Amino acid sequence: FIIYKGIGVINWKFLTSPPSDGMTGGGIWPAIVGTFYLMIGSALFAFPVGVMSGIYMNEYAPKGKLVRFIRVMTNNLSGIPSIVFGLFGMALFVKYLGFGDSILAGSLTLGLLCVPLVIRTTEEALKAIPDSYREGSLALGATKLQTIRYVILPMGMPNIITGLILAMGRVSGETAPILFTCAAYFLPQLPTSILAQCMALPYHLYVIST
């Protein structure tokens, strides 16, 4: 239904031109670029933090109550409404750290939103690798770090990448976090700095629909 009703107005000009006439005309190019910037920024934050945390939890952390508690808290973070992350991002990044409404603040907030998913995906990917590979690598004289870097991570990377793609899919559709941290109502020019505001497709759709 959406494709049937919308295909008549979707063309190259609509996709590559800025909005005009107070959002009643023009296209969505700045919103596309802004969404892309936010996805890249959140990935640059969430991927290293989430993957390294997942590696530590699965490969280094001693099994016990503390690890179980951290896993429970990580799962709970996945269930927190996105608007709570938005308010937290506004308080921490926009106000306390002084980033203001910016791509940087929005990217970090969205990164926090998807870190739990990346952690859990990384853990599950590493758990699926049989211990025989670890034992064989160690028996050949490799250190634990070398085993993780050259044996475990390459085997688990496809599933880890899948988790990152799922996280980016969630990030690309979130409105509440960027509402408080970076989204601009009408900004036909493309942002030139990570400390500038940007338009974004989820917020743009919200504005148009309301």
Indicate where each model-derived feature is located.
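Interhelical loop and adjacent transmembrane-helix boundary motif
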Residues: 20-22, 26, 178-210
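N-terminal, non-cleaved signal-anchor transmembrane helix
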Residues: 1-29, 33
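Membrane-cytosol interface at the C-terminal ends of specific transmembrane alpha-helices
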Residues: 51-71, 102-152, 163-167
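Residue-level signal for discrete positions within transmembrane alpha-helices
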Residues: 31, 35, 72-75, 79, ...
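Transmembrane alpha-helices
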Residues: 43, 144-182
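Generic hydrophobic transmembrane alpha-helix motif, especially the helices
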Residues: 75-112
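Transmembrane helix-loop junction
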Residues: 5, 17, 54-59, 91-95, ...
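Transmembrane alpha-helix signature in integral membrane proteins
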Residues: 28-55
